[in-house]
UniProtKB/Swiss-Prot annotation:
SUPFAM superfamilies: CbiD-like (SSF111342). The keyword Methyltransferase applies. Its EC number is 2.1.1.195. Pathway: Cofactor biosynthesis; adenosylcobalamin biosynthesis; cob(II)yrinate a,c-diamide from sirohydrochlorin (anaerobic route): step 6/10. The lineage of its organism: Bacteria, Pseudomonadati, Pseudomonadota, Alphaproteobacteria, Hyphomicrobiales. This is Cobalt-precorrin-5B C(1)-methyltransferase. It comes from Brucella anthropi (strain ATCC 49188 / DSM 6882 / CCUG 24695 / JCM 21032 / LMG 3331 / NBRC 15819 / NCTC 12168 / Alc 37) (Ochrobactrum anthropi).
Length: 368
């Protein structure tokens, strides 16, 4: 058996996935190149930076600009094998001297968002550049200026051409970040198919809702169930959490940062997984247990003759349709079990939980 035909396992495939770099790392490298050129007239290319955990990656410059009193450098973001919407975007840093005593000042250029709501790590009115990238860029400026005996009074404008369109594919509009993307990252490294960015956005969404005094938030597994719940409540956009498959990300954060009421809305299959006790509802990380469904169906009055049909059904939807065909309500016991899982995860936190189960057309099958 040769290498081309040798089977691979998931751990091997995962190990072969290529890492990438965050927008914050790219912005820091671009800032280092631009400031170096502003002082010396020469752009370092490639440019290396030290990440928070000590790694030293090097970045090729995709753009250079040197003018009267300013310098610009751009780096194309490489997210590795992660399906990141900012992959391929050009992160540009423009630097110029600030008035004495100003220190390092950050501005949002084209395609970088501005924070408009309280509750985020950055206050309203500021460029959506998160704390770690700000610290990395500030340290770079202080280091370079110290080398040349200059005060670190620098204005840094980060821009991302096309960033306003890219931002429409992110959670920024709901978080009240307008005009573009955020410059993010805590380690500087993008790990392929990591859940951390999504869960981070869920947490920030809860923070924004709490800061706005919102007493009720909605987490949905998809747009169909979200629309069904919104038809009932018409919540403001900042009260809608992009939960997706990460029910645990919502519940565990609310356990520590409670809001009065949480509605979880989802399709039958996703909420069956939550009912089983799964907190990550993605198909690759949790599966529907047909024996669990049969136990509930039997309690609901399903005949013994239906047992094998349920146990060997291809999908949860097939089970739902089978039980509906004889007039059984499977959605309510699923909703009740899902609510049990949610309350157990909250561990007594003062959060009232509502579960809404929908079909694929958005019709509400159960609400408890």
């Amino acid at each position: 058996m040769n290498d081309e035909t040798a089977p691979t396992n998931k751990s091997q495939e995962k190990a072969e996935l290529r890492r990438g770099w965050t927008t914050g790392a790219c912005a820091t490298a671009a800032t280092k190149a631009a400031l170096t050129a502003l002082i010396t007239g020469e752009f370092p290319d490639p440019v290396g930076i030290i990440l928070p955990k000590g790694e030293v990656p090097y970045f090729q410059l995709a753009y250079e600009g040197l003018g009267d009193g300013y310098a610009m450098a751009g780096i194309v973001k490489d997210a590795g094998d992660d399906p990141d919407v900012t992959h391929g975007a050009t992160i540009i840093s423009t630097v110029f001297p600030a008035p004495p005593g100003t220190g390092v000042v950050f501005r949002a250029g084209e395609g970088v968002g501005t924070v408009t709501r309280p509750g985020l790590q950055i206050p309203p009115g500021e460029a959506a550049i998160n704390p770690v990238p700000r610290r990395m860029m500030t340290e770079i400026c202080e280091q370079i200026c110290a080398e040349y005996g200059l005060p670190a009074d620098i204005v840094i404008t980060i821009s991302v051409p096309g960033g306003e369109e890219i931002a429409k594919k992110t959670w920024n509009p709901r978080l009240g970040i307008v005009g573009g993307i955020s410059i993010l990252g805590t380690t500087g490294v993008v790990h392929p198919f990591s859940c951390s960015a999504w869960i981070h956005s869920i947490h920030r969404g809860i923070d924004v809702a709490r800061a706005a005094g919102q007493k009720h938030v909605l987490g949905a597994t998809g747009s169909t169930s979200e629309d069904a719940a919104q038809a009932l409540y018409d919540l403001p956009d900042f009260a809608i959490l992009d939960m997706g498959d990460f029910a645990g990300g919502v519940l565990k954060y609310l356990r520590e940062h409670p809001i009065d009421k949480l509605t979880i809305a989802g399709g039958f299959a996703k909420l069956t997984k939550l009912a089983q006790g799964a907190l990550d509802l993605h198909s690759s990380r949790s599966q529907v247990d047909k024996s669990f469904l049969w136990t509930l169906a039997e309690k609901a009055g399903a005949p013994e003759s239906m047992k094998d049909q349920i146990l060997f059904a291809n999908t949860a939807l097939e089970v739902l349709e089978l039980t509906q065909s004889i007039g059984l309500d499977m959605a309510t016991p699923i909703a009740l079990k899902a609510k049990e899982t949610a309350l157990e995860t909250l561990r007594g936190a003062p959060v009232a939980v509502e579960i809404i189960v929908t079909d694929r057309s958005g019709n509400i099958l159960a609400r408890v």
